[in-house]
Amino acid sequence: MHLENGPLTKEYVMQFINEAYKQGFDRIQILDHTHRFKEFEVIYQGVKDASDYQKEWLANKKMKFKDSLSSYVRLINEVKSEKTPIEVLFGLEVCYVPEYKDEIERILEPYQFDFLVGAIHSIDGLLYDMPWSKEILWDKYNVDDIYRRYYELIFDLVKSNLFTQLAHPDTIKMFSYYPSYDLKPTYHELAQLLVEHHVKGECNTGCYYRYHHPDKGLSKELLDIFKEHHVDIITASDAHKPEDVGTCIKDIYKLCRYD
């Protein structure tokens, strides 16, 4: 559950907590993207340089790089000091950029978050999930090459040992572009890496209800391979506002269970 569309206040956090409690959850994870925080602006330089669309998007200081990590930590401590109706864990979703691995580690080192989610949102600086992505990426480059590079970056993320979870492992499918080659060997390699590095794989419903992709979470093929390798799977509604908390989670939870 992301706080990015609201303030870093206890009152706003409680909207998410209360909605989750109403739906019967006993534990939730609350986080925000690193593009909210000033400390992480340096790792987005490649995204800015890659496209004028992206440079303009990241220049919106009302939404991007507007808060400090210390403000977020103060909020976390404030919420944790009070009794909440359910368990609340706090973390970050970090845009992983291989060339900034050391910088990311340096920024994170002073903090003790409950979890850290690593995510790949760009292919060497070109965002794959934005309205302009078709123009700058999908219509310009070979789909097979995009997929191969995406999973190379995912593998590097997992091997970095910086993260406890991997965000939306197959959201590269968002606009329903698919490679011509068989992804199963890639999925098996990813599953093995997740187990080896003790990283949870996320089954995220956001691609379904926010972007209208037919899969409610992970593709059946990827989910089956994760379960074959006994990957620790975590469900996520990717809620960016309180009313989206838990969307479709019940539908995917039963699919992700190990019976």
Task: Please report, for each region that a protein language model flagged, where it lies by residue.
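Short, charged beta->alpha transition segments
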Residues: 73-78, 103-106, 152-157, 190
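Short, hinge-like loop/turn segments at secondary-structure boundaries
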Residues: 46-49, 108, 134-135, 184, ...
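Short secondary-structure boundary/capping elements
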Residues: 68-71, 149, 214-218
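Structural preference for beta-strand elements that scaffold enzyme active sites
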Residues: 27, 87-91, 114-117, 164-165, ...
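Charged catalytic cores and adjacent phosphate/nucleic-acid-binding surfaces used
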Residues: 1, 13-16, 156, 161-162, ...
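Alpha-helix C-cap/termination motif
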Residues: 23, 82-83, 110-111, 160, ...
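An N-terminally biased module of ancient metal coordination in phosphate/nucleic-acid-related enzymes
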Residues: 1-98, 103, 175, 181, ...
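Divalent metal-binding pocket/active-site signature
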Residues: 10, 35, 96-98, 111, ...
